[in-house]
Amino acid sequence: YRAKPTDRQQTAAGRLLDSPEVDLVLGHHAHVVQPVIRRDGDAVVYGLGNLLTNQPGDEANPCRSCPPQTQDGLIAWFQVTETANGAQITDAGYVPTWVDRTTTHEIVPIGVDDPEQVGPGVLAESAVRTAAMVEPALRRLTFTAG
């Protein structure tokens, strides 16, 4: 569970962004949120975290090798605008998510109808960990009822 991209990941992302055909690179499978970088209207999301997991972690079957960061994830959003010089990312945001590892393995979008059975401190800590990895490259999206 590496919170930072490897040299290989960084080299590959840089080479992809060097191409005029690539504006966005989305990485996955790190099982933890990894940094987001913006470069000249392009972006790299190195790791989206866990959006689906069957790793154990409930009281009956704890995952001793799974740090809390393996329950973090994000839904990324990008606005792409066509310009005279090609496409450019003109806005970007995210919604932090948290994996409930009890019987449902539900993905909880933090700040969107948070479930009562999950302590608010748990969700807040997850959101802080995610923000530390992706801000300021992405802004946190908020939702209002109604």
Q: Residue ranges of each PLM-predicted region?
A:
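Conserved beta-sheet core of the metallophosphoesterase superfamily
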Residues: D7-L74
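Short acidic, glycine-rich surface-loop motifs adjacent to enzyme active sites
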Residues: Y1-R2
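Alpha-helix initiation/capping motif
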Residues: T6-D7, P109
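A short C-terminal boundary segment appended to hydrolase-like catalytic domains
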Residues: T53, A60-G146
